[in-house]
Every structure is written in C-alpha cells, then in structure tokens.
Amino acid sequence: MKLLHIDSSILGDNSASRQLSREVVEAWKAADPSVEVVYRDLAADAIAHFSAATLVAAGTPEDVRDAAQAFEAKLSAETLEEFLAADAVVIGAPMYNFTVPTQLKAWIDRVAVAGKTFRYTEAGPQGLCGNKKVVLVSTAGGLHAGQPTGAGHEDFLKVFLGFIGITDLEIVRAHGLAYGPEQRSQAIDAAQAQIASELFAAA
C-alpha cells in the first residue's frame, strides 16, 4: 500500500500537526509494515500557487512550451500523479487565520483536476477518488470544530475531499493549543490516544 504523507505547517519542530501526522504514519507502519510512504513537505518545498500561467501551460502543446510552461506543467503532473498513486493520505492541516495554510491550498489546486479526481456529469459532479482513505490531522490554537470560525478549515477540507469522492475520512483533532500549556498538553494527549487506540486497532 502506498501512503502519501503531507505536512503544511511552517513551524518546523514546534508544530503540533507535524508531530501528530508523523505519529499517525508511524502507527500505520507498525500496523502494516508493507506500507510504502511518500513524504511531501509543503512548507519546505512549497508548490507554486495556481495562476494564469498554470492554465496556459496546461493548454499549450508539450512540444511548444517554453521553459516556464514546461516547469508549470511538470509540477502539476507530478503533484497529481503522486496523489493518484496513493492508496491513503495523511494530511497535517493546522489552522492559520481561520483557514488552511496557503501551501496546502496550493497543493489542493493542483490535485483538484476535472477528469482526473472528479468529473461533471448530467447528474452533477462525481468524485473519482472514492478508493482512498484520508486521515486529517487538524490543529488549531482556538476551539473551532463545529463553529462558524471552522468553516474555512476542517469544513472546507471535508467539502473538498467529499467532492473528489473520498468518504473514508478520519480526523485526528488537537484544538485549543494556544489556551495554555495544560490545555495544549491535554489536546495533544487526547489526539495521541486516538491514534493509538482507535485508528489502527483493527488494522
């Protein structure tokens, strides 16, 4: 099984989402040693944001693309193929200013591709990635789950994943991290307990 592990936090070793996403992957490997992990750090190796140049590159025949267009097309193709090849995805998704990191949004824009991850039909849009499992590691300084302030974070990610057909979704949540050392410790402990006792108990 191929597992795509994505981190998007800019905080490096101080990141709770990185710590927890790593622990999810480690637990997954312990439950299934055959797992092949591909790691993408969207902060250290940021993907260029979706732009007019991206669309122009996609619409230009390969043999007449200039260097910039070739780079854009290659980036889009490699990012998409990496996602399509994965059987499962672990996404570290901290909340920044009520939404996901811009680096994660740039990745989403490269994998939300009509005809590849979804398609339009007479009955409406149809997701094409229903065979994938996703574990979303959601972290935030405040308490936003189920609140209007969380609409651009977890809710947005659930809408996107559902749109491309993913229904096998687990959320590991550590919120309230900025409410003090005790609250932070409790939130991380609860997330770690979920990883250890729930995610892979039957794996």
Curated annotation (Swiss-Prot):
> Which EC number(s) does UniProt give?
1.6.5.-, 1.7.1.17
What are the UniProt keywords, alphabetically? Flavoprotein, FMN, NAD, Oxidoreductase
InterPro entries linked = Flavodoxin_fold (IPR003680), Flavoprotein-like_sf (IPR029039), FMN-dep_NADH:Q_OxRdtase_AzoR1 (IPR050104), NADH:quinone_OxRdtase_FMN_depd (IPR023048)
A Pfam family: Flavodoxin_2
Molecular-function annotations in GO: electron transfer activity; FMN binding; oxidoreductase activity, acting on NAD(P)H as acceptor; oxidoreductase activity, acting on NAD(P)H, quinone or similar compound as acceptor
Q: Which organism is it from?
A: Pseudomonas putida (strain ATCC 47054 / DSM 6125 / CFBP 8728 / NCIMB 11950 / KT2440)
Q: Which cofactor does it need?
A: FMN
Q: Recite the lineage of the species.
A: Bacteria, Pseudomonadati, Pseudomonadota, Gammaproteobacteria, Pseudomonadales
- Does the keyword tRNA-binding feature in the UniProt annotation? no
Positions bound to FMN = 9, 15-17, 95-98, 139-142
- Protein family per UniProt: Belongs to the azoreductase type 1 family.
Q: How is the cofactor bound?
A: Binds 1 FMN per subunit.
Q: What role does this protein play?
A: Quinone reductase that provides resistance to thiol-specific stress caused by electrophilic quinones. Also exhibits azoreductase activity. Catalyzes the reductive cleavage of the azo bond in aromatic azo compounds to the corresponding amines.
Q: How does it assemble?
A: Homodimer.
* Keyword Flavoprotein applies: yes
Q: What is this protein called?
A: FMN-dependent NADH:quinone oxidoreductase 1
The gene designation is: azoR1
User: Which Gene3D superfamilies would you find in this protein's record?
Assistant: 3.40.50.360
What is the catalytic activity of this protein? 2 a quinone + NADH + H(+) = 2 a 1,4-benzosemiquinone + NAD(+); N,N-dimethyl-1,4-phenylenediamine + anthranilate + 2 NAD(+) = 2-(4-dimethylaminophenyl)diazenylbenzoate + 2 NADH + 2 H(+)
